[in-house]
Every structure is written in C-alpha cells, then in structure tokens.
Amino acid sequence: LLYNYDSIIEDETDTVILVEGVFDVIALTRKLNLYNNPSVAVVATFGKKISDTQIYKLQAKGVHTIVIGYDGDATEAIKKTGDQLNEYFDCYVADIEDSSQDFDSMDFWEIYDTFAFRLKTLTEYKLNKIQI
C-alpha cells in the first residue's frame, strides 16, 4: 500500500518522491504545486520502510527515479530503503538539514533548499553521515 499511488501515471511519471506519511504527501504536493505535474508524484510508505511489493508497484508504473524524502531523523531507515531501491531505480536522498523536521513542518524555501542544494546520491548521503 502506497498513499497517493494513483497519482503515478504509467510511463509518464518519471520521478517519485517517497515520504513517510500522508501529511508529508499533502504538504509537498501543495507547497511545490505538483497537482498538474504528471512527471513528478509524491507517495507515502506509511512508515520508514518499503516492501518488495511496494517496489514492484513503482516498477510496474515505469518510474525511473526515486527521491527518498523521509524525516530528518530517519538516517538508518534512509540507508536501508536506499539500498533496496538503488537496485531498481536512480535513487537520491532529499537530505533534510534539521533532523527534527519533515516536509509538513518546513516552509517553501526550506523545501526548495533541500531539493536544490541538499539532494544527494545514496553514496553521497552515506558518506556524509559517517561519524568520525
């Protein structure tokens, strides 16, 4: 089950932003005005993990790129989900700077900065999170 899965148009939606919950979907769709943009969809996994069935559903729709937009405090879940998705999709992470925030609590400019300046490949994200 993926919330807002129906917004993915087969072979037309190229990029999916994957978030944890319903309010994140609503917030991103509204704040980025994605209502009439068939090439990008925001969907929720209802938590910090993704199942093989959910991955298959995304593949079946012809999605090529996944941006993981889990909450800032979900570092380990992002790494694990990224490893699962990286096998099948071009996978990126929207690295939320403040670990206490999510897209629902962020304003437009904070979201813009996250996607414009903090979008990372999975490898970049993992390297950035190494504690020395």
Language-model region placement:
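Glycine-/acidic-rich phosphate or pyrophosphate-binding loops and their flanking alpha/beta elements
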Residues: L1-T13
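Helix N-cap/beta->alpha junction signal
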Residues: V19-G21
